[in-house]
Amino acid sequence: MNQQRFDDSTLIRIFALHELHRLKEHGLTRGALLDYHSRYKLVFLAHSQPEYRKLGPFVADIHQWQNLDDFYNQYYQRVIVLLSHPANPRDHTNVLMHVQGYLRPHIDSTERQQLAALIDSYRRGEQPLLVPLMRIKHYMALYPDAWLSGQRYFELWPRVINLRHSGVL
């Protein structure tokens, strides 16, 4: 029997930690760490809402730290803890509904209802995550939002899902 070597959350953790590690290799700055944290907010939220809520205030205090390497080491450990919680349909649903709120001013009530139905269908296990993600990405292309476009959530999950379904993993 062909067993999966990594689950999807483990692959996300590998990608996320690799990117964080590269920040340090390329010259660590407060701005780079804040940008990283901002790009990964939805990924973090999908993995652990409680850890996400703890990490936010920690990051907000980055300017209090004299030694950026010490901050980085603490942050890295906290990200490891956060990402050790596997993402689950409940938390993905929360993320998708959060994103739906960003799109609300741009999509009409029929589109909102259709998106809500796709999200709910995913929540009930009737659709894969990729279905509501692709609809959201479609709306993001029609109604660009800089913050949403920068979210790694919309790159990493489809990449992992596609790798899984292509037989690479």
Regions found by a protein language model. Give the residues of each.
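Acidic, Ser/Pro/Thr-rich low-complexity regulatory regions
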Residues: 2-169
